[in-house]
Design a protein with these regions (language model features):
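Catalytic cores of Mg2+-dependent Asp-rich isoprenoid enzymes
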Residues: 1-86, 102, 125-134, 138-240
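Hydrophobic alpha-helical segments and helix pairs
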Residues: 85-132
Length: 240
């Protein structure tokens, strides 16, 4: 039952992120279910934070996940994803407080004030990724946590920029204010298709692409490494 439910979640997120299937093929067979569950769990929480339009609905969903992460920490998980993660000594050693921060950081990411600079914007996603790094270290003891945080932050920033219209509907701005100022475009004008908006997005993609090239790759998780390469390819295609 749990295995079937996990497979359903993997199928769901593979449809949204095709490179996930490739990454899971390289995972050790014994640890593959937990690796898949952790990836899908984080994706579910990011989706609730950044892709549910109504704030109140997003908050209810995130509060539910916060309760479920607390249940996981207490050894009483109910959801198939958290049930799959239970029983691993390294994950079980993660404190309830850390799981709680992993959930609350998602809402903070949604409600962050507009960022002045590219680095300020990246810090928004980095704060979320930092809360999930200990879970990655629990499953990948050799992972470079700082490199994983940087790679995940850039992945989140790219997806948020590509979903610009959706973010604006939530009154969020996934681009730095300095970029709007440089192109002399207001937030309201950003909501309308235009050559100026296309130029802003190309510049943001260029920033992200350069930052991706600087990420240390030797000790990333398999999923982060595969996703990073796929995102670099996406940036190249969109920047043409």
């Amino acid at each position: 039952m749990v295995a079937d439910a996990l497979s359903s979640h993997v199928d769901k997120w593979t449809a949204a992120e095709p490179e996930l299937a490739l990454a899971l093929r390289f995972a050790d067979a014994a640890s593959r279910p937990r690796i898949a569950a952790l990836i899908c769990l984080e994706h579910e929480i990011v989706h609730a934070a950044l892709h549910i339009a109504e704030r109140d609905v997003a908050l209810v969903k995130l509060n539910w996940w916060a309760e479920e992460l607390a249940a996981l920490a207490a050894g009483a998980a109910r959801h198939p994803l958290t049930q799959t993660l239970g029983g691993n000594a390294d994950l079980d050693a993660i404190s309830p407080g850390q799981w709680g921060r992993a959930a609350s950081a998602a809402m903070s990411m949604r409600e962050a004030a507009p960022a002045a600079t590219f680095q300020d914007l990246l810090a928004r996603y980095r704060q979320f990724a930092e809360c999930w790094a200990p879970m990655q270290q629990a499953l990948y003891s050799a992972v470079d946590a700082d490199a994983w945080i940087e790679a995940r932050s850039l992945a989140l920033a790219l997806r948020d920029a590509l979903a610009l219209h959706h973010a604006l509907q939530q009154d969020r701005l996934p681009l730095p204010m300095e970029l709007l100022a440089r192109h002399q475009l207001s937030r309201s004008e950003l909501a309308q298709p235009s050559a100026a908006r296309d130029a802003i997005l190309r510049e943001q993609i260029s920033f992200l692409s350069r930052a991706m090239k600087a990420v240390k790759r030797s000790r990333l998780t398999v999923h982060a490494a595969v996703q990073l390469r796929a995102d670099e390819y996406r940036c190249q295609r969109m920047h043409k």
